[in-house]
Amino acid sequence: WIMGHMVNAIYQIDEFVNLGANSIETDVSFDDNANPEYTYHGIPCDCGRSCLKWENYNDFLKGLRSATTPGNSKYQSKLILVVFDLKTGSLYDNQASEAGKKLAKNLLKHYWNNGNNGGRAYIVLSIPDLNHYPLIKGFTDTLKQEGHPELLEKVGYDFSGNDAIGDVAKAYKKAGVSGHVWQSDGITNCLLRGLSRVKDAVANRDSGKGYINKVYYWTVDKRATTRDALDAGVDGVMTNYPDVIADVMNEAAYKSKVRLATYEDSPWVTFKK
């Protein structure tokens, strides 16, 4: 999965997919009442990027739906996975469940079209704080209450705070999650970060006993870092330059080992070599 980083304006969906991304990451900011409000990152953000692009969240969802609904004039068949980077740092811990409920209602209405031929992309809810694990139950309970438990097949989870792997496992246990887990590791492109935790996450994934199904590394903009990440065995790389990742994947050393994921590749099933 080549994951386009910080895709917060509707026009950027096409821009990143056309550069080679089959997945995008979108920031979601919340208002004081835990309503998802804007797709907005703000300052500071990655070096070399504008931090200030934004849409109203519901408008972005409608644009995303158009891009991921077969038959729509805006349809992009390659776009199969969307990571919502939930900026819950602005919320009190006791608002996490409420944020999950409201997120579920927004997605159901504006993205899934109330279960009636909505967008087809898989969704990952990425949460920066382990203490906000109740967001997951708020989300899953709401989809069930609204009569659409089947849509949970399309939803996965990520804790993005670079916490110890054991602590993340405990948070999932509390949230009642087993499966559909992506584990992120990374840092802004302005700084360097080693791959030791990525390797731990890959080992957990491949042990057959761990909680992790997929591992992604962020933010990867250079060819050398891309090669290191692919060598470490990641499933996804998040990038500001999807074309760089696509180029590396076409190099002789990687061409026979990795390929771009398609809609038929489940993002929840650990790839067996």
UniProtKB/Swiss-Prot annotation:
Does the entry annotate any disulfide bonds, and if so which pairs?
A: 45-51, 47-190
Q: Which GO terms describe its molecular function?
A: lyase activity; metal ion binding; phosphoric diester hydrolase activity; toxin activity
Instruction: Name what cofactor the protein needs.
Output: Mg(2+)
| Taxonomic superkingdom | Eukaryota
Q: Which residues bind Mg(2+)?
A: 25, 27, 85
Gene3D superfamilies noted in UniProt:
Phosphatidylinositol (PI) phosphodiesterase
Q: Which is one Pfam family of this protein? A: GDPD_2
Q: Where in the cell is it found?
A: Secreted
Q: What class of enzyme is it?
A: lyase
Primary localisation category: secreted
What GO cellular component is one of the record's annotations?
extracellular region
In the record, biological process GO terms are: killing of cells of another organism; lipid catabolic process
Write out the tissue specificity statement of the associated record. Expressed by the venom gland.
**Cofactor binding annotation:** Binds 1 Mg(2+) ion per subunit.
Q: Which reaction does it catalyse?
A: an N-(acyl)-sphingosylphosphocholine = an N-(acyl)-sphingosyl-1,3-cyclic phosphate + choline; an N-(acyl)-sphingosylphosphoethanolamine = an N-(acyl)-sphingosyl-1,3-cyclic phosphate + ethanolamine; a 1-acyl-sn-glycero-3-phosphocholine = a 1-acyl-sn-glycero-2,3-cyclic phosphate + choline; a 1-acyl-sn-glycero-3-phosphoethanolamine = a 1-acyl-sn-glycero-2,3-cyclic phosphate + ethanolamine
Q: Which residues form the active site?
A: 5, 41 (nucleophile)
Q: Which UniProt keywords apply?
A: Cytolysis, Dermonecrotic toxin, Disulfide bond, Hemolysis, Lipid degradation, Lipid metabolism, Lyase, Magnesium, Metal-binding, Secreted, Toxin
Per the UniProt entry, the Enzyme Commission number(s) are 4.6.1.-
Described function? Dermonecrotic toxins cleave the phosphodiester linkage between the phosphate and headgroup of certain phospholipids (sphingolipid and lysolipid substrates), forming an alcohol (often choline) and a cyclic phosphate. This toxin acts on sphingomyelin (SM). It may also act on ceramide phosphoethanolamine (CPE), lysophosphatidylcholine (LPC) and lysophosphatidylethanolamine (LPE), but not on lysophosphatidylserine (LPS), and lysophosphatidylglycerol (LPG). It acts by transphosphatidylation, releasing exclusively cyclic phosphate products as second products.
The similarity annotation says: Belongs to the arthropod phospholipase D family. Class II subfamily.
Protein name, as recorded: Dermonecrotic toxin LhSicTox-alphaIA2biii
Taxonomic lineage of the native organism: Eukaryota, Metazoa, Ecdysozoa, Arthropoda, Chelicerata
